[in-house]
C-alpha cells in the first residue's frame, strides 16, 4: 500500500530541496467545485503529486481545492496535463505562476482535508457560493481604477495590505478572512450604489467574497481574475501600467513578490521604509513582523531586546523558558500589537 504522507523530518527535506540543481516553478491554483469524497480525492491526488516531486500546501474540501505548490521545471507541463485530466472540473483550471521565484518556496508536500478550502465562517444555508461577481481582466482593472464610481476592496489580511495594495483601495481591517466578510458588508453599505471591485492574492478569497456581497444585496460586484498575481503578469505582458503599489505578500518562504519599486511599509522597530517580513529568530516567539537590515543586525533577527537576550541563552535554558508557553506563533498588527497565529508563515486559508 502506498505511503500517503511524509515521513522525513523538515530539516532533512529542506536541506534536500536546497541541494537540488534543477530549478522549480511556484504555482498556485484553486477551484470551487463539488468533491463528493475529499479524503479519497486527496489520497489519489497525493500519489500524482509525489510522483512528480511536487512540494507545497494543498487543501481539499467538499467545496473544492486550494493549492500553493512548487514543481520541477522539467515536469511543469506533465503536471499540467495530469491535473487537467484528474477530474473534469479541473480541466483548464487557471495556474497562477509566481512573479518572482527562486524555486525555494516549499520543501515538503502537505495535503489536508478541511471543512472549507477558505475559512469563511459562513453558516447561512441559503448562501450560494457559485453566484459570484463578474471577472475583471488587467485592462478592465485599470479602467475601473480611473472610474470615480468604482470602489476597490482589498480582501486580504492587514499584514498583506500593509506592504502593498491597489491605488486608493479600501482595507477591511481584520486578521482573518472570516472576520472580514461581515465587516465588508457593514463598511460598504454607504457605497451600495457604487461598483464594488474585490481582489486578493490569487483570486480565491475575492471570488467567495463577491458571492457574499451579492448575497447581501450588492448588485454591482466585480472581482479581479486571478487576483494580484494574474493582474500583474497580464499587465506587464500587455504593456499596461501596473497600478498595484508595493509588494504582494505570498504564503510561502518568499513572503513577498515585488510588484512596483515603491516601498510603502515601515520597519516595525525603527520606522525606516521597509517591506520585508520575517519571523523572530527566537523559537519561543516567531513573531511575523517587518524588519529592516539595520534592525536585523542590531537585534540579531529578533523582534525585541527581550527575545534577543533570550536567544543568547544556552539552548537548555531557552527550552526551559519555552516550556508551558503558549504554543502558537504571532503576527504583528500596528494597531493591536501581537496576535496569535497558527503558523510562522500565516495560513492562506484563514
Curated annotation (Swiss-Prot):
Top EC class of this enzyme: oxidoreductase
BP terms from Gene Ontology: tRNA modification
Documented EC number(s): 1.14.-.-
Comp. bias intervals (Basic and acidic residues): 319-328
Highest taxon of source: Bacteria
Catalysed reaction equations from the record: uridine(34) in tRNA + AH2 + O2 = 5-hydroxyuridine(34) in tRNA + A + H2O
Annotated function: Catalyzes oxygen-dependent 5-hydroxyuridine (ho5U) modification at position 34 in tRNAs.
The protein's name in its UniProt record: tRNA uridine(34) hydroxylase
Organism, as annotated: Salmonella heidelberg (strain SL476)
Amino acid at each position: 500500500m502506498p505511503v500517503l504522507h511524509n515521513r522525513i523530518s523538515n530539516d532533512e527535506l529542506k536541506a534536500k530541496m536546497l541541494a537540488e540543481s534543477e530549478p522549480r516553478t511556484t504555482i498556485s491554483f484553486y477551484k470551487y467545485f463539488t468533491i463528493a469524497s475529499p479524503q479519497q480525492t486527496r489520497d489519489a491526488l497525493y500519489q500524482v503529486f509525489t510522483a512528480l516531486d511536487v512540494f507545497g500546501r494543498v487543501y481539499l474540501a467538499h467545496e473544492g481545492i486550494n493549492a500553493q505548490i512548487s514543481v520541477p521545471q522539467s515536469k511543469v507541463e506533465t503536471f499540467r496535463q495530469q491535473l487537467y485530466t484528474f477530474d473534469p472540473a479541473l480541466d483548464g483550471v487557471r495556474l497562477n505562476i509566481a512573479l518572482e521565484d527562486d524555486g525555494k518556496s516549499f520543501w515538503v508536500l502537505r495535503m489536508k482535508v478541511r471543512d472549507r478550502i477558505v475559512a469563511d465562517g459562513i453558516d447561512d444555508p441559503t448562501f450560494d457560493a457559485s453566484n459570484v461577481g463578474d471577472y475583471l481582466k488587467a485592462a478592465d482593472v485599470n479602467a475601473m481604477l480611473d472610474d470615480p464610481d468604482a470602489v476597490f476592496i482589498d480582501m486580504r489580511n492587514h499584514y498583506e495590505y500593509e506592504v502593498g495594495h491597489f491605488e486608493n483601495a479600501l482595507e477591511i481591517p481584520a486578521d482573518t478572512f472570516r472576520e472580514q466578510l461581515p465587516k465588508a458588508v457593514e463598511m460598504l453599505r454607504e457605497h451600495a450604489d457604487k461598483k464594488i471591485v474585490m481582489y486578493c492574492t490569487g483570486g480565491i478569497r475575492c471570488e467567495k467574497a463577491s458571492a457574499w456581497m451579492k448575497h447581501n444585496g450588492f448588485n454591482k460586484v466585480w472581482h479581479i481574475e486571478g487576483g494580484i498575481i494574474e493582474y500583474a503578469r497580464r499587465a506587464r505582458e500587455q504593456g499596461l501600467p501596473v497600478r498595484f503599489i508595493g509588494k504582494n505578500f505570498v504564503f510561502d518562504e518568499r513572503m513577498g513578490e515585488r510588484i512596483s519599486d515603491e516601498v510603502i511599509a515601515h520597519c516595525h522597530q525603527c520606522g525606516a521604509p521597509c517591506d520585508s517580513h520575517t519571523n523572530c529568530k527566537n523559537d519561543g516567539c516567531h513573531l511575523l513582523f517587518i524588519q529592516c537590515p539595520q534592525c536585523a543586525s542590531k537585534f540579531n533577527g529578533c523582534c525585541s531586546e527581550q527575545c534577543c537576550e533570550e536567544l543568547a541563552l544556552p539552548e537548555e535554558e531557552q527550552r526551559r523558558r519555552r516550556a508551558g508557553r503558549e504554543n502558537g506563533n504571532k503576527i504583528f498588527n500596528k494597531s493591536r500589537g501581537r496576535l496569535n497565529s497558527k503558523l510562522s508563515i500565516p495560513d492562506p486559508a484563514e
